[in-house]
A protein has these predicted regions:
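Class I S-adenosylmethionine-dependent transferase superfamily signal
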Residues: 69, 143-144
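Helix-to-beta-strand junctions that scaffold the AdoMet/dcAdoMet cofactor pocket
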Residues: 129-130, 148-150
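A short, conserved alpha-helix within the catalytic core of class I
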Residues: 129-143
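Class I SAM-dependent methyltransferase SAM/SAH-binding core
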Residues: 54-109
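Conserved class I S-adenosyl-L-methionine
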Residues: 1-50, 153-168
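Residues lining the SAM
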Residues: 123-127
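A short acidic, Gly/Pro-enriched loop at the edge of an enzyme's catalytic core
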Residues: 110-120
């Protein structure tokens, strides 16, 4: 899937340094519980069940979830985001783990050197990308698959609009 550059830029423009300063409080503290009816603790459980010590975090956000759930004191953690503000915020939070930082567009083929990952999180990413859910999900997973170990796991969550039929 090839998204127009302006569409991609608009999709992540909200993640300014100022907005990221409030993100954990607003999204993880209030919105998850009261607007989306999915308490942050449920997402932490998802991470605890699937994150490994060889992990790629797609859509770095603030680094909250890997910071709270990393199963190793010396992991290999990589952050991938198109937004420099998110990468800086998450890398600062995860500095003790010395994260790899990749500023790339997940809707395009990715260049990530080194061994493949045992876990890849795509959390709160798909709804931020431009385009139809089926097309952007296919593109994202096609671009991540070459970077996942054969027995690895991709996990995450997204927000669905009212017009999306939910399988669960």
């Amino acid at each position: 899937m090839k998204a127009e550059r302006s569409d991609v830029d608009r999709a992540h423009a909200i993640y300014t340094k100022g907005n990221l300063a409030l993100y954990d409080w607003w999204v993880l503290g209030l919105s998850n519980q009261w607007i989306w009816s999915c308490p942050t603790e449920k997402l932490l459980d998802l991470y605890r069940a699937h994150i490994t010590a060889n992990h790629l975090e797609v859509g770095a956000g603030t680094g909250y979830f890997p910071a709270k759930t990393m199963p190793s004191a010396q992991p290999r953690i990589a952050l991938l985001d198109i937004n420099r503000n998110c990468l800086e915020k998450a890398a600062k939070r995860l500095a003790a783990f010395r994260p790899e930082v990749h500023q790339e567009n997940v809707l395009e083929p990715l260049i990530i050197r080194g061994e493949r990952f045992d876990s890849i999180a795509v959390n709160y990413v798909l709804h931020c990308l431009p385009g139809r859910l089926d097309q952007k999900a296919a593109a994202v997973f096609d671009h991540l698959a070459p970077h996942l170990q054969d027995d690895g796991v991709i996990f995450g969550s997204t927000l669905l609009g009212l017009d999306i039929q939910r399988p669960l």
